[in-house]
Amino acid sequence: MGIEGVLEKGFVTTSADKLINWARTGSLWPMTFGLACCAVEMMHAGASRYDLDRFGVVFRPSPRQSDVMIVAGTLVNKMAPALRKVYDQMAEPRWVISMGSCANGGGYYHYSYAVVRGCDRIVPVDIYVPGCPPTAEALLYGILQLQNKIRRTNTIAR
């Protein structure tokens, strides 16, 4: 967490930024936005073998209850407004993980007229997880990278 000092009688000193970011990294609640086969790997990551609950990651069904959106799969033009609407309904601070080649840049369907060539054209993306489909380990690594990114951010304006 970044303990700055330990005082007598069991007191610990740290900054408010470090304390808030430590709490945020321990309770990431992702909104699952599974669009294709990558969603199966996302479910695999939440199952007993990898158990994302031990990292404080609890999948939520509502955007108002979540602070992370995992976009997994091919984003088509008809689904893009719905993706943006769900993103806008999430509370601040919010983060987006783009999972798979299709979500990152269109993937196999890149040249199709109906496919958005990357969900970063619709919502700002914080972490890209490559693969077709990416493994559960890759998603887990992406979540750990997001936790590292959150730890480095400043919460309180100076």
Swiss-Prot record:
One of its GO terms (molecular function) is quinone binding. Binds 1 [4Fe-4S] cluster. One of its GO terms (cellular component) is respiratory chain complex I. Keywords: 4Fe-4S, Cell inner membrane, Cell membrane, Iron, Iron-sulfur, Membrane, Metal-binding, NAD, Quinone, Translocase, Transport, Ubiquinone. It is found in: Cell inner membrane. It catalyses: a quinone + NADH + 5 H(+)(in) = a quinol + NAD(+) + 4 H(+)(out). Belongs to the complex I 20 kDa subunit family. This is NADH-quinone oxidoreductase subunit B. It comes from Thioalkalivibrio sulfidiphilus (strain HL-EbGR7). The lineage of its organism: Bacteria, Pseudomonadati, Pseudomonadota, Gammaproteobacteria, Chromatiales. The gene is nuoB.
